[in-house]
Swiss-Prot record:
This is Coenzyme Q-binding protein COQ10 homolog, mitochondrial. GO terms for cellular component: mitochondrial inner membrane; mitochondrion. SUPFAM superfamilies: Bet v1-like. Residues 1-34 form a transit peptide. PANTHER family: COENZYME Q-BINDING PROTEIN COQ10 HOMOLOG, MITOCHONDRIAL, SPERM PROTEIN HOMOLOG. GO terms for molecular function: ubiquinone binding. Keywords: Membrane, Mitochondrion, Mitochondrion inner membrane, Transit peptide. It holds the Pfam family Polyketide_cyc. Required for the function of coenzyme Q in the respiratory chain. May serve as a chaperone or may be involved in the transport of Q6 from its site of synthesis to the catalytic sites of the respiratory complexes. It comes from Danio rerio. Coiled coil: none annotated. It comes from the Eukaryota. GO terms for biological process: cellular respiration.
Length: 233
């Protein structure tokens, strides 16, 4: 019985191998190119692949900037607080003087107040870090010596941009607590990806620029403490 089973098994293997050989021989006749007797490649029948179905369409590739990032716009936020040896009035004057931004704010090429001078105002700003140069309009509202708020109302760069500065008296003499908050969302996916890469460095340089401006105008102040929070939503 065992010998018969073995014989049947071997026979089945032979048949299987023969069928496989026949399939391979038939497939070889469909080869795109064959070597002719003269040794020259000669083109034969070519079967074109079927057109791709809807389910197999190629998915557009993501930006080369960040291949793992989702193809969506992201609103980004940053907040920071500092206690420094300048009065609330001094820091307020630095931040509220929007027309002077072009002199000390990084990447600010032009800054011009187009409406209002003391108190609430409208300003046009031009920012640029090559190859990007953009203009936008900002509505600035203030609470003298306490708060400066700016909101982008027109421009091709941002879907949303808002900055907020608050100044409160510090624990000692000529000092104050400065709170800074910014939230923004670019219209362009490319700009959004660039912001994700350089976000921390750009915002920190912006905040440092205002403290450096105060130092230039009022003398050396002491930077006492710093806390920052960043998140993208």
């Amino acid at each position: 019985m065992a010998e018969k089973a073995t014989s049947l098994f071997l026979r089945a293997m032979e048949i299987s191998e023969k069928q496989s050989f026949d399939v391979m021989r038939r497939n070889s006749s469909c080869t795109i190119r064959h070597l002719s007797s003269c040794g020259i490649l000669e083109t034969r029948r070519v079967s074109l692949p079927p057109p791709p179905s809807a389910s197999s369409q190629m998915v557009p590739s993501r930006s080369f900037i960040n291949l793992t990032a989702p193809l969506i716009m992201r609103r980004m936020e940053y907040s920071e607080s500092r206690s420094i040896n300048y009065s609330p009035e001094q820091m307020y004057d630095v931040v509220a003087n929007v027309e002077q931004y072009q002199q000390f704010v990084p990447w600010c090429k032009k800054s011009k107040v187009t409406r209002g001078r003391n108190g609430d105002m409208r300003a046009q700003l031009e920012i640029g870090f090559p190859p990007i140069v953009e203009r936008y309009t900002s509505e600035v509202t203030v609470i003298p010596n306490h708060q400066v708020r700016a909101v982008c109302t027109d421009g091709s760069l941002f879907n949303h941009l808002e900055t907020l500065w608050r100044f409160t008296p510090g624990a000692a003499g000529q000092s104050c607590n400065v709170e800074f908050f910014v939230t923004f969302e670019f219209k362009s996916l490319l700009h959004s990806q660039l912001a994700t890469m350089f976000f921390d460095e750009v915002v920190k340089q912006m905040v440092n620029a205002f403290e450096t401006r105060a130092k230039k105008l009022y003398g050396t102040g002491v930077h006492r403490q710093q806390a920052s929070l960043r998140r993208a939503i």
